[in-house]
């Protein structure tokens, strides 16, 4: 669902977007680079120099080229590249912003109104705070503590109360028209609901 943010924005904004990826369980079966590609077990033995062992958020190994990690120093996905220079962009909301800037429909990211753009950014940042709490919850799900449960519950309630307050004053989250703040929320909430079933 996090990559959906950029896909939906590109569709609404009238631009083409190339997305390469796979399901989380298949991530170790790819060589991550600007031109990411699937790899076989045989390939993996030849790509040992690109192997990155699990640190957090996944188990096993992933394979990422030096060029990938230069552009994405945290080594996370989703990961985007933009421009002829193939500049690396990481974090789903940053990729979302980059896509929105390229869209024909500039209103998705506030248009010429820099104050609205800043307001949209505020909601995107609040989104990430909630997402971070939820990710910790998911990673501990098999051995959840009462502390983590209560912290996630409080973050969820705080986040939704803020959105409800905003929506009581306007038709959309950041104002009176659809923006990437709405798209980001819908995708993050879909992730939350989806993961809640497992």
Locations of the language-model features?
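GST-like domain detector, emphasizing the conserved glutathione-binding G-site
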Residues: 1-153, 158
């Amino acid at each position: 669902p996090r990559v959906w943010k950029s896909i939906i924005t590109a569709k609404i904004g009238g631009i083409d977007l190339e997305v390469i990826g796979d399901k989380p369980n298949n991530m170790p079966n790819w060589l991550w680079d600007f031109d990411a590609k699937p790899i076989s077990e045989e390939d993996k033995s030849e790509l040992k120099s690109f192997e990155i062992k699990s640190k957090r958020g996944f188990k096993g190994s992933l394979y990422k080229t030096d060029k990938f990690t230069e552009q994405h120093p945290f080594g996370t996905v989703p990961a985007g590249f933009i421009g002829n220079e193939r500049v690396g962009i990481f974090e789903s909301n940053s990729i979302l912003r980059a896509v929105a800037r390229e869209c024909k429909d500039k209103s998705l990211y506030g248009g010429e109104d820099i104050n609205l753009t800043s307001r949209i950014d505020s909601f995107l940042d609040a989104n990430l705070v909630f997402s971070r709490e939820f990710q910790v919850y998911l990673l501990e799900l098999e051995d959840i503590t009462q502390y983590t449960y209560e912290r996630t519950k409080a973050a969820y309630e705080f986040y939704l109360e803020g959105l409800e307050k905003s929506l009581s004053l306007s038709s959309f989250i950041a104002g009176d028209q659809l923006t990437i703040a709405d798209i980001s929320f819908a995708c993050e909430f879909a992730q939350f609901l989806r993961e809640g079933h497992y």
